[in-house]
């Protein structure tokens, strides 16, 4: 009877890719999804759409983002949208509510809370600081 082990090791060929190859593939998936996020930051996006664009399954994209960015794909999209909204706040007089809505934040209070968590100041505090430096 064969045991499937030879010399204490499994002799069957490994089905896992080397770690560096897995990392390269994961990073490629992440970068494709991030490019989609940048192009369509103001449009509704689903995780399934991001995975299709990246050329992988939803689960593979989730794992790739966790490995490469330390966050979920949707958290990365939210972060990109917040960064774009921050740039929009710096660009001119458009209302905070309009900028938030443009980047798919439909609840102004939640937008302000997330913004402050990420940037350390609320959108209105950012505006006030800009007014002091430019005015």
Label for each model-derived stretch:
Residues 31, 35, 39, 44-49, ...:
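Terminal helix-turn-helix DNA-binding modules in bacterial transcription factors
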Residues 11-14, 47-76, 100-122:
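Basic/polar phosphate-binding segments, predominantly the helix-turn-helix DNA-binding elements
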């Amino acid at each position: 009877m064969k045991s499937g082990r030879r010399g204490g090791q499994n002799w069957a060929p490994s089905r896992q890719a080397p770690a560096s190859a897995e990392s390269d593939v994961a990073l490629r998936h992440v970068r494709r999804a991030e490019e989609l996020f940048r192009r369509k930051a103001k449009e509704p996006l689903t995780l399934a759409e991001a995975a299709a664009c990246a050329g992988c399954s939803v689960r593979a994209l989730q794992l790739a983002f966790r490995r490469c960015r330390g966050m979920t794909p949707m958290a990365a999209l939210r972060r990109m949208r917040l960064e774009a909204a921050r740039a929009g706040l710096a660009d001119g007089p458009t209302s905070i509510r309009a900028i938030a809505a443009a980047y798919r934040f439909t609840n102004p209070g939640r937008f302000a809370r997330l913004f402050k968590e990420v940037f350390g100041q609320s959108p209105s505090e950012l505006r006030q600081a800009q007014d002091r430096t430019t005015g």
